[in-house]
From Swiss-Prot:
Signal peptide: none annotated. It comes from Influenza A virus (strain A/Chicken/Hong Kong/220/1997 H5N1 genotype Gs/Gd). The keyword Glycosyltransferase does not apply. A motif (Nuclear export signal) lies at residues 137-146. A motif (Nuclear localization signal) lies at residues 34-38. It holds the Pfam family Flu_NS1. One of its GO terms (molecular function) is protein serine/threonine kinase inhibitor activity. One of its GO terms (cellular component) is host cell cytoplasm. This is Non-structural protein 1. Homodimer. Interacts with host TRIM25 (via coiled coil); this interaction specifically inhibits TRIM25 multimerization and TRIM25-mediated RIGI CARD ubiquitination. Interacts with human EIF2AK2/PKR, CPSF4, IVNS1ABP and PABPN1. Residues 1-73 are annotated as: RNA-binding and homodimerization.
Length: 230
């Protein structure tokens, strides 16, 4: 096993522990708590994959961080912080919408890259909007936290979420996953719209109804992917 993989996991475990202590003092805002909850799932998945105990990894991560801080001067720390662009967190869903459980009468699930797509194929003839919580950097989508499909009545009928055991995804991965979800929902004569905010940081263009305008090549690719699978 790569030593960098192990030490990265150890540091992530300790930093999560620090953030959890911060949240326990009721100091975290909604985006902070949302990331904390999702990072916990990711760490559990990584720990299982690597075969490492999270408590032991947290202690080792503490030693690594302490050693770095002892060697770091205040001036170097200021320069590092100033040189790293800070991502922005955009929330289209409330915590209730993100944490709400939902059921599928005819479930369909597909994994593409490190993203899991789930949808209810029993839904027909509905108007559906896709909303997401995600981070952006340099005015482009950096990381998807969670995307969900809602009917006009507020029911959840689809979802795209990162797999805890496979961290990391690209903007292109998110676009492809959205295309698969849209195609699957439209298969049953549903009308699907993408929220304006999500649209702005992915394709950066839309029609008057907020429908994503996929490039022709990508649209053909999505059609070939969707027809035999959904």
């Amino acid at each position: 096993m790569n030593s960098n993989t192990v030490s990265s996991f150890q540091v992530d475990c300790f930093l999560w522990h620090v953030r959890k202590r911060f949240a326990d003092q009721e100091l975290g805002d909604a985006p902070f708590l949302d990331r904390l909850r999702r990072d916990q799932k990711s760490l559990r998945g990584r720990g299982s994959t690597l075969g490492l105990d999270i408590r032991t990894a947290t202690r080792e991560g503490k030693h690594i961080v302490e050693r770095i801080l002892e060697e770091e001067s205040d001036e170097a720390l200021k320069m590092t912080i100033a040189s790293v662009p800070a991502p922005r967190y955009l929330a289209e869903m409330t915590l209730e919408e993100m944490s709400r459980d939902w059921l599928m009468l005819i479930p369909k699930q597909k994994v593409t890259g490190s993203l899991c797509i789930r949808m209810d194929q029993a839904i027909m003839d509905k108007d559906i909007i896709l909303k997401a919580n995600f981070s952006v950097i340099f005015n482009r989508l950096e990381a998807l936290i969670l995307l969900r499909a809602f009917t006009d009545e507020g029911a959840i009928v689809g979802e795209i979420s990162p797999l805890p055991s496979l961290p990391g995804h690209t903007e292109e991965d998110v676009k492809n996953a959205i295309g698969v979800l849209i195609g699957g929902l439209e298969w049953n004569n549903n009308t699907v719209r993408v929220s304006e905010t999500l649209q702005r940081f992915t394709w950066r263009s839309s029609d008057e109804n907020g429908r994503s305008l996929l490039p022709p090549k990508q649209k053909r690719k999505m059609e070939r992917t969707i027809e035999p699978e959904v």
